[in-house]
Amino acid sequence: GIIATSITSPALAASRSRIDSRVDTAMRELKSLGNRFSNLIDSSAGILMMPRIRRGGFGFGTSYGEGALLIGKAPVEYYSIASASFGLQFGIQRYSSAMFFTSERSLTRFRRQDGWTVGADLGYTLIDQGDVIDIDSNTYTDDVYGVIFGQEGLHIGISLEGSKYSRIVR
């Protein structure tokens, strides 16, 4: 409870330049995993990159992070991701996530909404890092793909489901 709240507090809000730097680092890390993500990176209408999401909890868990929506590899808007949950979970973890919008329609829908809850407002497919090698622009079946990478620490019960993305001003 208290530990999780202090770790994931929005008081840790970052400046625009710090977010840009963290997004660049996360993108390099994602690319360093091999060519498996090349097709998604190159052909996506937009990428919502959320580096350094902090998650913590003991029974009650919270998470918070800030990142940028990239269109044409340039940041165009800034977002936060936050969640709260109750259940079988414990630990502290830091990780990054990327949401790949594979169509202009899904990207436009995301940008027009005032907040977006994963799994409720738009369907997505969470892909395992090892599965990406089989995904290319000819086999996309969903408008949004998500990946979690760069995990540090241990947290039982990690998921993007129920996390809320909100536009922020930086």
Question: Which residues does each PLM region occupy?
Answer:
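N-terminal export signals
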Residues: 1-9
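Small-residue-enriched, tightly packed secondary-structure blocks
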Residues: 13-170
